[in-house]
């Protein structure tokens, strides 16, 4: 504890400034002046508003009770970056969304994951497929941070094979009655608005799935106990329970039987935005490791002077920069209307696996201190691993890329 108290504040303080110097020249190759200014402003906001709570969020497994991070991010206009201005959004592109995801995740992986589920999985689904009435009803409060959003596809026995879901929506007068369960729902315990997929025709396979907008407090809808996760702690995750939950017809998102279209049409962009999360975690690893090896002395000199430590830093740096370049080049293509499924799967596959390795290297650079929870490196490793599993496992991403390449002429 004493060692951490002696080293950690200086490391994080010096690491922040050092990181800005180290990466300013590289980022200028990726961003125009406006995007660079946006990145600096989000960085400052995240470091001042979110980063001070990161360790406590991980330890307590919940967001701070005395600070409403959702509302603060809403006040900073981060939730609706890709949403139309008429609903309170910014009307910007995925370059900006990825920048925000990177910097928030750099400050706290848990907050970054919850932010991504809210702004990307929920808000963007409503933007792309909501009716004018649905957008007017739900988007303003989600964008302001007054309400929290979530999305639920997976079930206890339906993860990667999402089309095999058992949650059923039976058509009745005026709407549908939903019965079943959803699993691993990020933001589930705190969400007021949820996009949920259910089978409206069991015999129709992928053509029998429909997307619904579920509101907290609907009779028959409840959340089970919050899940105790290895990492991304504080980013609330739970099981959703539907017991004869009536959902009015006007809460169908898109059309009946078109749920897979709603799901798949946004999945590529969802993978892209989430891929910026591992970028932020890799940056956070370097924020800690580089200043530490400058200060930590063994054999009479800073350990950063030893070539094997410099080699680790070089590997960490190139993993970060190659991942960052890949993510933002794909984001730029998406903003230009060129959405490539294999590239969107590729960016999160590559960045997620690199982030886990970079976090391991950061722990190794800190040695015994890296294994102590007073330092952030262990948290960064536990957070990074999620991105190899959530939003489609690495194995599924490889399958998507291989399938797309096989189909090409």
From Swiss-Prot:
It is found in: Mitochondrion. It comes from the Eukaryota. Pfam families: Acyl-CoA_dh_1, Acyl-CoA_dh_M, Acyl-CoA_dh_N. InterPro entries: Acyl-CoA_DH_CS, Acyl-CoA_Oxase/DH_mid-dom, Acyl-CoA_Oxase/DH_mid-dom_sf, AcylCo_DH-like_C, AcylCo_DH/oxidase_C, AcylCoA_DH/ox_N, AcylCoA_DH/ox_N_sf, AcylCoA_DH/oxidase_NM_dom_sf. Its cofactor is FAD. FAD binds at residues 151-160, 184-186, 296, 307, 364-368, 393-395. Belongs to the acyl-CoA dehydrogenase family. The active site is at residue 270. It catalyses: 3-methylbutanoyl-CoA + oxidized [electron-transfer flavoprotein] + H(+) = 3-methylbut-2-enoyl-CoA + reduced [electron-transfer flavoprotein]. CDD domains: IVD (cd01156). Homodimer. This is Isovaleryl-CoA dehydrogenase, mitochondrial. Its EC number is 1.3.8.4. Residues 1-22 form a transit peptide. SUPFAM superfamilies: Acyl-CoA dehydrogenase C-terminal domain-like (SSF47203), Acyl-CoA dehydrogenase NM domain-like (SSF56645). Its main location: mitochondrion. GO terms for biological process: L-leucine catabolic process. Substrate binds at residues 160, 206-207, 261, 268-271, 391-392. It comes from Oryza sativa subsp. japonica. The lineage of its organism: Eukaryota, Viridiplantae, Streptophyta, Embryophyta, Tracheophyta. GO terms for cellular component: mitochondrion. GO terms for molecular function: 3-methylbutanoyl-CoA dehydrogenase activity; flavin adenine dinucleotide binding. Keywords: FAD, Flavoprotein, Mitochondrion, Oxidoreductase, Transit peptide. Pathway: Amino-acid degradation; L-leucine degradation; (S)-3-hydroxy-3-methylglutaryl-CoA from 3-isovaleryl-CoA: step 1/3.
